[in-house]
């Protein structure tokens, strides 16, 4: 009887182990686009990344990920960054 109880407890603990060791991953969005005021800064390639990052609560500290800036009418610019983590909701 003791052996069965020990075996049962061991199985339960081992089944919990993978869920404890796997870190929670944030979802990744396929694209992120947003329009901001001002013109595109051709010397600062992180401009769009920083602008998008500042509009979200907390996406962590990431390196810029394939961001582009496209001039728009009326002194606006379209920022497009691929593969940024989705903002938490």
UniProtKB/Swiss-Prot annotation:
Cell location: Secreted
Keyword Protein transport attached: no
Disulfide topology: 29-86, 40-69, 48-79, 67-81
A Pfam family of this chain: SCRL
UniProt signal peptide: 1-23
GO annotation, cellular component aspect: extracellular region
UniProt keyword Metal-binding present: no
Protein name: Defensin-like protein 250
Organism: Arabidopsis thaliana (Mouse-ear cress)
């Amino acid at each position: 009887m003791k052996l069965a109880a020990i075996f049962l407890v061991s199985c339960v603990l081992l089944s919990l182990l993978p869920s404890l060791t796997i870190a929670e991953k944030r979802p990744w969005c396929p694209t992120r686009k947003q329009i901001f005021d001002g013109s595109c800064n051709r010397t600062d390639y992180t401009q769009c990344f920083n602008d998008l990052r500042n509009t979200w609560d907390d996406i962590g500290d990431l390196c810029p990920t394939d961001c582009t800036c496209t001039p728009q009418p009326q002194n606006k610019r379209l920022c497009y960054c691929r593969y940024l983590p989705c903002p938490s909701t």
